[in-house]
Amino acid sequence: MARLLLAEDEEVLRMLVSDTLEDDGHEIDEACDGEEALNKIMAHDYDLIVLDYMMPVFTGLEVIVKVRAIPEKKHSMILMLSAKSQVSDQRAAMDAGADYFMAKPFSPIQLSEKIEEILK
């Protein structure tokens, strides 16, 4: 179906979400921090980039700002995931350039449904 990058520093959550999305037929690349995510974004084209807000090395916000500054990557679709669910956090993500925001906690099924909605 689609090629996605899942950048999430919580290993158990990353594995659970990745397995769910693979079961949906998606090809998933994984990153455990912002630097690894940025390197993969530079090396590949993704239908959707799913970023955790708070990650080591570069936060999700920092990754978004860097991606939006690269002409050939600036139109990448980005979904920000975050345990920081205040309106100000959502606004910060959208102001940085996220296309979508989803607050934690969520079930893998809820994320799967959100991704299907985005990719339509």
Across the structure, where does each feature detected by a protein language model lie?
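C-terminal output helix
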Residues: F106-I115
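Conserved acidic carboxylate
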Residues: E8
